[in-house]
Amino acid sequence: MSSIIKQLPTVALRGLTILPGMVAHFDVSREKSIKAVEEAMMDEQEIFLLTQKNPEEEEPTAENLYSIGLVAEIKQVIKMPNDLVRVLVEGIERAELNCFTETEEYLLAEVIRFTEDGLEDIPENAREAMIRCLEEKYEQFCTYNSKNGKEAAKPIQEIHELDRLIDTIANSIPIGYEEKQRILEAVTITERYEVLMAILLREIDIATIRNDLAMKIKSKVEKNQREYILREQLKVIREELGEDNTQSDAEQYEESLKKLKAPKEVKERIQKAVSYTHLRAHE
């Protein structure tokens, strides 16, 4: 894998990682970030995006930034209220930070742009197997996580290039920026495939457990509702028969008797007394 070194204005992102092929927007308010966007717009509209390891850091240094970032093309810049600038970008390719060049106004990075050649090393049958596995697992993921179910997975069936398929799926699944950073840092196709598959399998497992728990809770709630309705219906029937609370009291005695710790002979005498009282109540 060869590399090309280039200098690019740089923005440090907080709580956000953008992947190649992804169209996304972010807001910047730090003076250095705004200046970096302005510098990029005056040149080729390319900007280097690095994600902060600690989103709370106000003045991030190289040590507080992930070394693998994204070269992106700025599509639109909008000035917002409160001195915010909203930037719309499209991810072009992953790149690595080599070093920062001294400048007080904004971050200027010397970046190493990768020229990917790992795809040709994967045998055709292996590549096809990887594509089919991704399609299958993504469809399963959509079944659990999308309102449209399997229908949401149909667009990827038109993609037959492994690298493009990986980027498309990675951009469509709702995962945190740290997980996306793992995908971004997987430079070779094989590494990226393995990271994405691990994420998909984990998300499917979580969704399966979540659905099982939801079904158990639903079943329990429905059972409790059925029992409540039956009890209310039985109460109405007893009232109609003039047996308002007598039968209920007898049942309570029966339940208490079962729980009572006493010799069998004592329980039998109590049982006879309860039965006698119940009969007298219906005379």
Where are each of the predicted segments found?
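Short, well-structured alpha-helical patches and their helix-loop capping segments
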Residues: I122-A126, M130, Q157-E161, T188
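Short, surface-exposed helix-loop/turn micro-motifs enriched in polar/charged residues
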Residues: H25, A62, Y66, N148, ...
